[in-house]
Amino acid sequence: MLYFLHFLSDGGDIFNLFRYITFRAGGAFFTSLAFGFLFSKPIIDLLKKKQKDGQPIRDDGPENHKTKKAGTPTMGGVLIIGSLLFSSLLWCRYDISYVWIVIFVTLGFGLIGFIDDFSKLYNNNSRGISGKIRLIIGFFIAAFATIWVIKIQDPSLSMALAVPVFKDVLLNLGWFYIPFAVFVIVGSANSVNLTDGLDGLAIMPVMLSLIHI
């Protein structure tokens, strides 16, 4: 949204900065940081109040989880996704479809997690939604996003894979690009899901991933 302020610029004032992605990326970083500082405690306190005993602990996990994680509220992803969504809508360009694709995928997988956590609390067990259902929904979200990307891309690039570091290297995967992209999206989402529950929960891998993006 703030990107449009650059239209007020005469070329030599502060409004001109909003056209540069580096400036807006820095602004998004500090906005997310401020969002976390301002809302983390109120949201955590609200979750603790509503959930009382916290999330149900899995029986097949480490023994110390039963004592260390007891009373820990679930649904903390609301804070992470809220921070990401707020800073994105504030600093990103609305005319770029990739922004909306990323937001769609993030909200889609976030909704799966929210429903899963809600199911655990409602049924008072650690099972939540079955893994098969989560995986199937995740594949549909990833497939839709992949086809969306292909539709908006130049036909000569729509099935091509860029190789990091090597600027001019493009691997044309053909139709294999679709299952490959779906696998990467679903695999990335589930790697965070599998990491969640260990020390540090999901926030550290999410932070490390989002900082470089």
Report residues per predicted region.
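"…together with the soluble PPM/PP2C metallo-phosphatase catalytic core" -> "…together
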Residues: 2-211
